Amino acid sequence: MRLGLIGPAKRNPKVLRERAEFVLDELRADRAVYLGVDGALDDVVKHWAHELVKGDPSDSAVWQRAAQSCANASAQQINAFLSAERRRQQLKQLECLPHANARTIELFESVVAVLIHDKALLDEEDMLPASILVFGRSAEPVIHKIGLRCFLSPGPVTHPSGGVALLAEEEDGNVRASLYGIDGSVVKSEVVAQPNRGARMTVQGGAAS
């Protein structure tokens, strides 16, 4: 799995859209989560979808759009319609945290990641099962390992050395975190979690341990 992480927009919808396009097109994330709680991504996606289909972008209106666009269209125009609809569907890969206090749990095989806007709201129940703790509220991009846990934040979307992060599961089951700068370059990348292969049981003095 490849999970994109997009930092808060800081009232900059233009840059937010550019970073969302980067996550979808360049990083090819399976899904992406916006870590702000200002509703900015909802607004960006709404306008983006409307721009693509030049009308009501809802699923329920797809047949109406098809009738209007394709009834007397050329093959080239039909291909353009289908391309726009595919892109509209792709926008569903962009998600938001449900609300300011919400936690979202993501599973990479046996690795648990908890996503939240403000890490100050993390409690013991959040931290115990999690190997990766992702948060949005941060002035700087962060990859910081403490023991077996990693704290990760992409930082604001306008940050020159961050704004976007990617959690990617590798072939060996390790999870790698990468930070991407505003120019699309990799700023930092490291393995932040390894799969739990299960505890080994040994017997010493007749007692299992």
PLM region descriptions:
Residues 5-8, 31-38, 65-66, 73-82, ...:
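Active-site neighborhood of phospho(di)ester-bond hydrolases with catalytic His/Asp-centered motifs
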Residues 28, 86-88, 108-111, 148, ...:
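Short, solvent-exposed coil/turn segments at beta-strand boundaries
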Residues 1-53, 66-69, 86-94, 100-102, ...:
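N-terminal active-site segment of His-dependent metallophosphoesterases
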Residues 16, 44-46, 126, 145-146, ...:
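Short, well-ordered secondary-structure micro-motifs
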Residues 116-178:
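Conserved beta-sheet core of the metallophosphoesterase superfamily
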Residues 11-21, 152-209:
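Binuclear metal-dependent phosphoesterase catalytic core
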